Amino acid sequence: MLVNLIESVYRLLWGDLFILPLGGGIGISFMVVLLLAAGICFPSRTRLLPVRLFRDMIAAVCEKKQGRDGLSSLQTLIISTATRVGMGNLVGVVAAVSAGGAGAVFWMWVTALLGASTSFIESTLAQKYRQPDPLYGGWRGGPAYYLHVLAERKRGKKLKRSVTAALFAASGLICWCGISQVISNSVSSAFENAFHIPPLATTLVLTAIAAVIVLRRNATVKSLDVMVPIMAVCYFVITVGIVLFNLPKLPAVLGRIFTEAFGLRQAVAGGFGAVLMNGVKRGLFSNEAGSGSAPCAAAAAECDDPVKMGFVQALGVLIDTVVICSCTAFLMLLVPQELTAGLAGMDLLQKAMQYHLGSFGIVFIAVTLALFSFSTFLGVLYYARGNVAYLCGDNWWSQTAYKLIALVMLVIGGMQAYTVVWDLGDVGIGLMTIFNMLALVPMAHEALDALNDYEKRKKLQ
């Protein structure tokens, strides 16, 4: 019953809204239309911000925290990078290539480049409309909070809760439960391949260790400060080393990505829609731009200008997809296709790592995925704080209850089928994006006005 409901909503969001009469027919979903519209609108209105103001984005990350409360710019980037790098760059890229082929990688790049401007706008708004957090200290915010402000403006009075804000918060909690399932599903599969450990045993150990960390009130940020930089650098160094070792093969891989991206073969077979759809879906799941996840961390930063936090999160999108996602994609695509035929999920990635590094590769990717998964789980629970508070008020019982639900979803995910687990995450992130866009479209001018003011002040300095 529940699986059927998830699949029905999934088809509504990601199924074909209409068919373009090209080749065998190209299916375009509602979510692709929505993201494409935002991807065209926001970069043009920010005048290609990632290109023009890249140096400012770097400078914003390096700024020190302005006060004692809240997080630094670097800490918010670490939290958002934890969820992006954790599942998006490993499991997300694997899913895109498994379902959409090499061409899906190109559409992930496009989603990131267009999404950086979207991330700037949503994170700037989150910083502008943040609120004090009486439970954890510091600040909290995100789309639920600026959706609430928008609803109060339209109604002309103070509201206890807004329907659209509550729907976003609920969608976020659903999505993050889905991500919890993806975590345990992928880790248990990787450990079964690497160490022949039964999925149930891996899942129970993973859940127990996660419980020790997350049931402590303020352990999340401290844990991520240590874990994320170390593991991201290690993974990046090893994957770049593999790519450089296989440099002569890289032109052929790039040719395959671009050839399949534009459907020169796929359009004839009617498969271009699958390439585009999987690239966009996994790109959104990876970099989170427009979904409203990262603004939940952006709101918590101590920052003297909301625009700077927009810069930080826009940079995070580029780091995630253009740099690290590409490394994972190249790892798989540098392997001869006949060796990975018929493989999907972590089986595909581990086979690729075995090809490059021998038996050590299987162990390396299993351990790396486990560490990344912890960072992702901690990151999404940090995102959930403000949304749980919006729905249930400021109390510890609701915060603890959601953490327990997420831990239960870890257990369930380890036992579920690969596709069912991804469907729940896709449903949640799709709904989040829809409700977030309901605020971004009418409120984007506020972020753009702040950007113009920032650039005017910069010229006077």
Say what each PLM segment does:
Residues 67-99, 125-128, 135-150, 163, ...:
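Alpha-helical membrane segments and immediately flanking helix-loop junctions
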Residues 114-122, 202-217, 228-248, 281-284, ...:
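Selective recognition of specific alpha-helical transmembrane segments in multi-pass small-molecule
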